[in-house]
Every structure is written in C-alpha cells, then in structure tokens.
Curated annotation (Swiss-Prot):
Species this protein is from: Haemophilus influenzae (strain ATCC 51907 / DSM 11121 / KW20 / Rd)
Protein name: Protein TusC homolog
Highest taxon of source: Bacteria
Function: Could be part of a sulfur-relay system.
NCBIfam families associated with the record: PRK00211.1, sulf_tusC_dsrF
Keywords: Cytoplasm
Length: 119
C-alpha cells in the first residue's frame, strides 16, 4: 500500500476525523483503491459506530460518508481488536466492515506504507 490513513481520534468535538475522511476521498481520485489503506485504532474506532446523533452537540453527521469507501472500492480497512474490546464494540455496531487485527500487526502494516496520514 502506498498511502495509509490512520484514525486515532474520536469523531466529534473537532474536525480532524472529517478532514481525514475528506483526504481519503480525495486520494481515491489519484490512486488505485488497492494503494490506499485505512486503519482505526484507539478512539478512532468510535468513527465507525452506527446511529450516532452528532446534531445533539451541534456537529455535522459525516459518519455515514464512510460508506462511500465501498463505492470507491477501498477494501484495505483494518481495525484494532484491542480498541474494539476497550469500547465493548462488535461488528454489528459498526457502519463499515473492517478486518480485525491486533495492534502489533496494525503497526507493522503502517510501517510498510509509503506515506502515513494520521487523523
């Protein structure tokens, strides 16, 4: 993979995660889908929880936009197993399917990327 996008922060309160998603969508215009890898670790896994209500805290609901990754054929998506366990989440609660991997394998894959963008 040439470009890796790492999500480490929660989705609301700042625009960091939304900007990360925008960066991924922009990258799909210039890269082949298999050149892009997306990783969720720590608070970043919270970006994938379905049925969030950010309008309650006057935030924009961008979470559903993650579903566009299927449309753009971005299939290299990984989520940290330990982070899921920390928040007691399972696949049924997530808006996007990702391959569950342990932290060490996730970090190994990140090290193989040509460029790394962290959000």
């Amino acid at each position: 993979m040439k470009i890796a996008f790492l999500f480490r922060t929660s989705p609301h309160g700042t625009s960091i995660s939304r900007e990360g998603l925008d960066a991924i969508l922009a990258a799909t215009a210039f890269c082949e889908p298999n050149d892009i890898g997306i990783f969720f670790i720590d608070d970043g896994v919270l970006n994938l929880i379905d049925n969030q209500q950010p309008e309650i805290i006057q935030q924009k609901d961008f979470i559903r936009t993650f579903k566009l990754l299927d449309l753009y054929d971005v299939e290299q998506r990984f989520i940290c197993t330990a982070s899921l366990q920390k928040f007691k989440l399972d696949n049924r609660e997530l808006i996007l399917s990702c391959e569950k991997i342990d932290r060490s394998l996730l970090l190994e894959k990140l090290n193989q990327a040509g460029k790394l963008f962290t959000f």
